[in-house]
Amino acid sequence: MTEGIRARGPRSSSVNSVPLILDIEDFKGDFSFDALFGNLVNDLLPSFLDEEADSGDGHGNIAGVDGLTNGHLRGQSAPLSSAPFFPEVDGLLSLFKDACKELVDLRKQVDGRLNTLKKEVSTQDSKHRKTLTEIEKGVDGLFESFARLDGRISSVGQTAAKIGDHLQSADAQRETASQTIDLIKYLMEFNGSPGDLMELSALFSDDSRVAEAASIAQKLRSFAEEDIGRQGASAAAGNATPGRGLEVAVANLQDYCNELENRLLSRFDAASQRRDLSTMSECAKILSQFNRGTSAMQHYVATRPMFIDVEVMNSDIRLVLGDHGSQPSPSNVARGLSALFKEITDTVRKEAATITAVFPTPNEVMAILVQRVLEQRVTGILDKILAKPSLMSPPPVQEGGLLLYLRMLAVAYERTQELAKDLRAVGCGDLDVEDLTESLFSSHKDEYPEHERASLKQLYQAKMEELRAESQQVSESSGTIGRSKGASISSSLQQISVTVVTDFVRWNEEAITRCTLFSSQPATLAANVKAIFTCLLDQVSVYITEGLERARDSLSEAAALRERFVLGRRVAAAAASAAEAAAAAGESSFKSFMVAVQRCGSSVAIVQQYFANSISRLLLPVDGAHAASCEEMSTALSKAEAAAYKGLQQCIETVMAEVDRLLSSEQKSTDYRSTDDGIASDHRPTNACIRVVAYLSRVLESAFTALEGLNKQAFLTELGNRLEKLLLTHWQKFTFNPSGGLRLKRDLNEYVGFVKSFGAPSVDEKFELLGIIANVFIVAPDSLPTLFEGSPSIRKDAQRFIQLREDYKSAKLATKLSSLWPSLS
């Protein structure tokens, strides 16, 4: 039987004689309609398939015929004969009708089976639902039973816990009562006769039960002391009942505790000698019951070799100060302290390991140890190197002075601060090691500002004495210097030195560094910095002011020489030497003062730069401190400015005096009124002009170098104005003809060219007006009225110059000008 169709018997050529049988199993699984259809029709179409096979390649097969391999008809068909084109159509129709009928029957069978299954499923579902409902009811009942059971268990547990608590409390009370009985028994033993410790229980003499004995003794003493305290309070209230107290017990307990403590300390020391850390730890633990173990801690620290060995202290001194009798330097002391403090830190670190292994409270022991190190060992070496000097009679500078003490103090403070940090890292418990370190220097820091200012004053005085000694030595070695050259010995030897001012600043900067080190609070730091900087301002102000005054003295000496020249000029023989001396003195003093001014400016710039770089930032955090220091700096330097101003005025007087001398001595009356002898006019400036310009160029070279900015402009402007007035006054002494007027114009050109280097517009303008006025000597008399038509402001000066014309009277210029310029008549 093939897939999809089962034949009941052999099949004939007539397809209607044999019905089809379809099985429901054919429709299960991977059902294929094409396969079912092919199995139905393959037996009815054999001739058609053969014709298709014989028709040759290229036509192909009827779609679906080759694939109809499933199913077959019952019986074999007869060979096809020549008949109609598709004779199997009737057979196929009959086949399809039978197939449809059987398919309908199969569907009815399937529907019947489905209805039966649905009924069975419904019945089973009802049974399951009923079963689940019953199960849920059972579970709910079970949960209720569990809840009741849990409540019962909790109740029983609470009852058991209460019973346990009662039992524990009863046991504790029993234990307490037992201990109390024992304590009362022991207390009665101690409350026997005073000082009698021979009848005590074996517990108090058994070395193996020392810890227990110590604990009981402490409890008994506490109880006895409290009882005595209560009796004392009752007696004070008037409710005391006469009776014997526990005073004897307290005394005996105290004696016993002292004896036991000493015994434990002895055992602790013996174990310490053997480095038996286990026994040491046991003793320390027992001793902790006596005053929290303070005696054991202090005893351990006090017995350290670095505190009891005299050689350790001597070694410390040699390490820091060197050999006996040598003068220690701060650098050597710094190295020595670093080495010593490193050794101390290493020793403390080793002790820390032992303390941690031995004591139950190592932090407390470390606090005691570090405190002892700072207060004994460090303080001992600090006392050796920091001998506070007296401000009334300070040590001389040759022996280091106050500066040596301050440097030692700074070095010691820095190294001790580093030691404190190292000890803090090792461990020092609750000890405030930084605060303790500060307390070691409190007496020094309290008076530090006074010592710092006194040191700066001492350094300044020593420097001034050194400069005076050098000046005197040079003066004595040089012998008597003649005054003919006009040199001032004191001025030349004591000129302002920028190097000296730099030393002042260097001292102050070092002091500020120490001040920053010792002053932790901003307000304190600002106050100390301000005071120290004020010392620098005073020193620089006094030094440069005195230097300027010495330079002014040189100018005054030159002025005195000029006075002697004026007095002696009537004597022809003495006039020349006096004039040379006055000129040399004036020029030398001028240059010396300009050098002083230049160095003064450089010194002030150094101070101002130092203030901006180092001082300002330390004062800004405190309101008003920076402004106050700026005002003090301005006030201090104003004294030097006043001295410089007076000296510059004297310089101008000196220059003008020499210019006046040169003009008076070198200017000839014939320079501006040459005779008409047929000789060509001289186109050169006059000799007096050449000498004056050469002198001014030479002497003012130092002024151009020394002065700058507004100071330079003001000085040269004043000098130019004074020169213009002097020339006006000088030229009014002469009579001018046209040739002399041309000579004057050449002089004026020289002067104008020189004063242009001043960079002073007002001076240039005045000299240009002089050039215009000088034209009155050149033009013809008839041209004079039109000469100043555009410049009415200079007519008055022009009239004075017109009067100097050689032809002023002969040409009756006065009458002509009075009619033209009536306001000038």
UniProtKB/Swiss-Prot annotation:
Expressed in seedlings, roots, leaves and flowers. Signal peptide: none annotated. Keywords: Coiled coil, Cytoplasm, Exocytosis, Secreted, Transport. It comes from the Eukaryota. GO terms for biological process: exocytosis. Disruption phenotype: No visible phenotype, due to the redundancy with SEC10b. It is found in: Cytoplasm, Cytosol; Secreted, Extracellular exosome. Gene3D superfamilies: 1.20.58.1970. Residues 244-266 form a coiled coil. GO terms for cellular component: cytosol; extracellular exosome. Belongs to the SEC10 family. Component of the exocyst complex involved in the docking of exocytic vesicles with fusion sites on the plasma membrane during regulated or polarized secretion. Involved in polarized cell growth and organ morphogenesis. During cytokinesis, involved in cell plate initiation, cell plate maturation and formation of new primary cell wall. The exocyst complex is composed of SEC3, SEC5, SEC6, SEC8, SEC10, EXO70A1 and EXO84B. Interacts with EXO84B. Binds to EXO70E2. Binds directly to B1L. This is Exocyst complex component SEC10a. The lineage of its organism: Eukaryota, Viridiplantae, Streptophyta, Embryophyta, Tracheophyta.
